[in-house]
Each structure stands twice: as structure tokens, then as C-alpha cells.
């Protein structure tokens, strides 16, 4: 009995790091600003058949409606209440999405905005997605309800009430982030209200949460809230399962708050990942792909089993958040596909793929003055995600997760899951290759000259279909074929002018 108790205790301690994905699924996608009805359809028609593990959804709670500028994406990060009522849909639509996605083995992870409410300067009234009244001036949010007792006004020690110095951890946690009213998360009443909201979502069937602005909350306050959370719904999850937690902590080094303070609560977003990988792919600061041999902890990244990794996210793809100009996005499609391919092939971290929408970028003095633009819409009503005959998306939805190269690398990651990093090769420059045990092999050419090499793949002999240039269809290959000999070696030729200068083969792409 003692042994059993110890085991269950260990299981409980580790549970918040487990994404509870269906067996063999390893990557989630952020369907940024998608409507619940579209996500439900996407789970059934695309994500499940292609082996995606789950979806990070935009904040589902009621938020402020901002008219100047007109309906920006960031209004969803200014809560008014915890009613499930946003431009992505109402509670019935949310429930239907969670049901339908779970039923095909695709998990839902909610972006939970629990550090703050709306901005201090917002006008009192009912300009909210569900019409709830609020008055920021006197801290009145009857939709929760919160009042003046529930905010950190008295605790913050700066004259402005806002964060003025990121070298002061207390300011970062107790003062207002960008003028947003900071909740007093050390108060049990506030913790209970936040936990009630999250428990409502857990009972509906979500698998976990991205905790927005975790850097701006004390790790102990987060833990106190997590301790109040229900186990996951046993309709889809095994008894005693705890919600998967990944905390948004922007830590590029050199500040008072560090990611490792949060490891006890769950995984943490590793913002260094995309910033550093972007520099390598762009060949900035003398970086080159050959240096990626010890990618991961060897590059000063957090422990792999604590990291949630991504090439870009909804913030830094438009210059917000962290990472700066090195971040690769769909605007840099060729390098972006290579970077996402590298991420999905490499064993480090738990991976998230971005799915974006188009906006009219307009750089003035180095800043995109349209970085606020919200999702494709008709008079503020979010447009449906239409699907074109070639399986790309219409209505200005980018849908990177539907790009063949990215979709097929999600499958690659599933196939090689658990296999060791192996058979590294590089040319001391920007041509590199590596394998995952005897299940997969990938080759990159990011140099300005052709690659022509015979490499040890570690794979069994046979003919393989390159899943970057094509697909395995009815036992044949629509792309490049790779011939692996009895010695495990194969010859690779990649032109530096190829549309996608990388090749990937795996056990299930064998013809």
C-alpha cells in the first residue's frame, strides 16, 4: 500500500506537465482568434486525421469591446467577467467544440487571463462582449463580482501604479502591466473566483491552460489557484488526471523574474527558443546551423521536460512580447518552414505550431503601426475559416498548420516520438542532418550552395518518400524519393534554390 501511495503521489506531482494528449500525438496548434464552430469542424476534418494533439484557443471569457482602434486582437486580454462569451462564440458553441474535439482525440487548452481585468482608463458602461456592466474607475466588475477590495492598488509601490522597473520583482507582480487592473491574487476570494472560472472549463472538458502573464503573478499565488482546480473530466481523461499547465513567462535573461521560479507549477513558455533559432536561420551574429548540434539545454534553454516551445506566437509575430526582429513568421515562409521543421524533428520540449491570420502590415520608423489589427471580420463579426479546394484557407486566414511541410512534420514528430537524437552531420556551415533513432531522418541546406552528400540515416533499407516535397499516396510518392541502402546510408541532393531546401523521411513514409 505504501508503494502504491508513493506512486500515486509521484503521478500527482508530475501531472501538470502532462498534456494528456491521445497516445502518439505530440504537437498542439494555436488557432488564434478562431471561432468555436470553426475549431470544432477543424478537429474533425483535419486535426484528428493528421495527428495533431490539441488546440490552444483564444480567451473564451467576456472581454472589453475596444472601438479605438477598432476591435484589436488584444481586447481579448482585457477581461470583464468569466462568462464564456466572446467573439469566438457563446458557451453552447464552446461546449460543442470541446465535446467534438475530445471525441476525436484532440485536446483543448484555454488561454486563461487571470492576472488582471481591463485597463484602468476604460470608460464605465456595457462595452463588453456580453453586455456586462463594468466601471474600472471604481474597480467595479459585477459580472464576477470584483470590487475595490480585490485589486493590488494598495500593494503596488510605484507612483504611477504601473510597472516601472523590471529589475524589481515585486513591481512586476504587484503593479499594473500596461495599465491593466492587477488582481490581488493573494486573497482567497479572488483565488476562488479564478478557480471557479477554470473549474467550469475543466468540467466542460478542457485538458489544461496557458496561464497568460504568469511572470506578473507570484508563483505561490498560481500554485494556490492550481490547488483549487478539479481533476479533468473522466468522460475523456483517466481518473485523477490534473490539468496541463503552461505558464507565459517571458524570460530572455537579465531581469528580476526568472522562468525557473515557475517550474513547480507546470511547464513554461521558452521564449529564447524562437529568438535564438530565428537568429541561426537568418545567419545573424555569425550564427550557423552547425552550432545546433547541442540545441536545447546546451544553448541555455530551460530543461526539456519543463519547456513549451514555438517558433513564433501571437505576440511576437507582430513585434509584441519577446524575441525582437529575429523571430520568424509566415511572412518569412521559406525560412519559417525550415525552422518549424527543425523544431518538430528535434526532441527538445513540447511543441506548439502557430496558425495566424493576415493583416496589412505597415512599418513606420521600424514599427508596424497595424500590429493591433484583429481577426478577419465583417463589421466586428469574425469571419468563418473557409477551406479552399487545395486545402488552404480563405477569408485571410493563413493556416500555417495546413501547409504540407508543417502538417507532415507534425506526423514526423509523432512517428519518431521517444526515439533518441542520432546520426548528426554538418558541414561546419549551414548544412546539417540528424536522425531520431531508426524512425526518422532530416536534412537541411541553409547555405548559398548546393548540398550533395551520402549520409547515415539509421533507417532500415528501402525507398522513402520525402514528406517535405510531397506525400505518400497509395503506396507512391508525389515528391522526392530517397533510397536507403542496406548500410543505412542514403544520398541527398538539395539545391540552395529549392522551394523548400530540406528533406525529411520516416518509418511511415517508406513506400
From Swiss-Prot:
Membrane-crossing residue ranges in chain numbering: none
Tissue occurrence: Expressed in liver and saliva.
Residue list for modification Pyrrolidone carboxylic acid: 16
Record-marked site positions (Transition state stabilizer): 315
Keyword Hydrolase set for record: yes
Disulfide bonds: 43-101, 85-130, 156-175, 393-399, 465-477
CC cofactor: Ca(2+); chloride
GO cellular component terms listed in the entry, alphabetical order: extracellular space
Enzyme class: hydrolase
GO BP annotation list: carbohydrate metabolic process; response to bacterium
Residues reported in the UniProt entry to bind chloride: 210, 313, 352
A GO term, aspect molecular function: amylase activity
Active site positions, chain numbering: 212 (nucleophile), 248 (proton donor)
Reaction catalysis annotation: Endohydrolysis of (1->4)-alpha-D-glucosidic linkages in polysaccharides containing three or more (1->4)-alpha-linked D-glucose units
Subcellular location(s) per record: Secreted
Cofactor note (record): Binds 1 Ca(2+) ion per subunit.
EC numbers on record: 3.2.1.1
Oligomer and partners: Monomer.
PANTHER family associated with the record: ALPHA-AMYLASE
Protein family (similarity comment): Belongs to the glycosyl hydrolase 13 family.
Protein name: Alpha-amylase 1
Gene designation: Amy1
Amino acid at each position: 500500500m505504501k508503494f502504491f501511495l508513493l506512486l500515486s503521489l509521484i503521478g500527482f506531482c508530475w501531472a501538470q506537465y502532462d498534456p494528456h494528449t491521445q497516445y502518439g500525438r505530440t504537437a498542439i496548434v494555436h488557432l488564434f482568434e478562431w471561432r468555436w464552430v470553426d475549431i470544432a469542424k477543424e478537429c474533425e476534418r483535419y486535426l484528428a486525421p493528421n495527428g495533431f494533439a490539441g488546440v490552444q484557443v483564444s480567451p473564451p471569457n467576456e472581454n472589453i469591446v475596444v472601438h479605438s482602434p477598432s476591435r484589436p486582437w488584444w481586447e481579448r486580454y482585457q477581461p470583464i467577467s468569466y462568462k464564456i462569451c466572446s467573439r469566438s462564440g457563446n458557451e453552447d458553441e464552446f461546449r460543442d467544440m470541446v465535446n467534438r474535439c475530445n471525441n476525436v482525440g484532440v485536446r483543448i487548452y484555454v488561454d486563461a487571463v487571470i492576472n488582471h481585468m481591463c485597463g484602468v482608463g476604460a470608460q464605465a458602461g456595457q462595452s463588453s462582449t456580453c453586455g456586462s456592466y463594468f466601471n474600472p474607475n471604481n474597480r467595479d466588475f459585477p459580472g464576477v463580482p470584483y470590487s475595490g477590495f480585490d485589486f493590488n492598488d494598495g500593494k503596488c509601490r510605484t507612483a504611477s501604479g504601473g510597472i516601472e522597473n523590471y529589475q524589481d520583482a515585486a513591481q512586476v507582480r504587484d503593479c499594473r502591466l500596461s495599465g491593466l487592473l492587477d488582481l490581488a491574487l493573494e486573497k482567497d476570494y479572488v483565488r476562488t473566483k479564478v478557480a471557479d472560472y477554470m473549474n467550469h472549463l475543466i468540467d466542460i472538458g478542457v485538458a489544461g491552460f496557458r496561464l497568460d502573464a504568469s511572470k506578473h503573478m507570484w508563483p505561490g499565488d498560481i500554485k494556490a489557484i492550481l490547488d483549487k482546480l478539479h481533476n479533468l473530466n473522466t468522460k475523456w481523461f483517466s481518473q485523477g488526471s490534473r490539468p496541463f499547465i503552461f505558464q507565459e513567462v517571458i524570460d530572455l535573461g537579465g531581469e528580476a523574474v526568472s522562468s525557473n521560479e515557475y517550474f513547480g507549477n507546470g511547464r513554461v513558455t521558452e521564449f529564447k527558443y524562437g529568438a535564438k533559432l530565428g537568429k541561426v536561420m537568418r545567419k545573424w551574429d555569425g550564427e550557423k546551423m552547425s552550432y545546433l548540434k547541442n540545441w536545447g539545454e546546451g544553448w541555455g534553454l530551460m530543461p526539456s521536460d519543463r519547456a513549451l516551445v514555438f517558433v513564433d506566437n501571437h505576440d511576437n509575430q507582430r513585434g509584441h512580447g519577446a524575441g525582437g526582429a529575429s523571430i520568424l513568421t509566415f511572412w518569412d515562409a521559406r525560412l519559417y518552414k525550415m525552422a518549424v521543421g527543425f523544431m518538430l524533428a528535434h526532441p527538445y520540449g513540447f511543441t506548439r505550431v502557430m496558425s495566424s491570420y493576415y493583416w496589412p502590415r505597415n512599418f513606420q520608423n521600424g514599427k508596424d503601426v497595424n500590429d493591433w489589427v484583429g481577426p478577419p471580420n465583417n463589421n466586428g463579426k469574425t469571419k468563418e475559416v473557409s477551406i479552399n479546394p487545395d486545402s488552404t484557407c480563405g477569408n485571410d486566414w493563413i493556416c500555417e498548420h495546413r501547409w504540407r511541410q508543417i502538417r507532415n512534420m507534425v506526423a514526423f514528430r509523432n512517428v519518431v516520438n521517444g526515439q533518441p537524437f542520432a546520426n548528426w552531420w554538418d558541414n561546419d556551415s549551414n548544412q546539417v542532418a540528424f536522425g531520431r533513432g531508426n524512425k526518422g531522418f532530416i536534412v537541411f541546406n541553409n547555405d548559398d550552395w548546393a548540398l550533395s552528400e551520402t549520409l547515415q540515416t539509421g533507417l532500415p533499407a528501402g525507398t522513402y518518400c520525402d514528406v517535405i516535397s510531397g506525400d505518400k499516396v497509395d503506396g507512391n510518392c508525389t515528391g522526392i524519393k530517397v533510397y536507403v541502402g542496406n548500410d543505412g546510408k542514403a544520398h541527398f541532393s538539395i539545391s540552395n534554390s529549392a522551394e523548400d531546401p530540406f528533406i525529411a523521411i520516416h518509418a511511415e513514409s517508406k513506400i
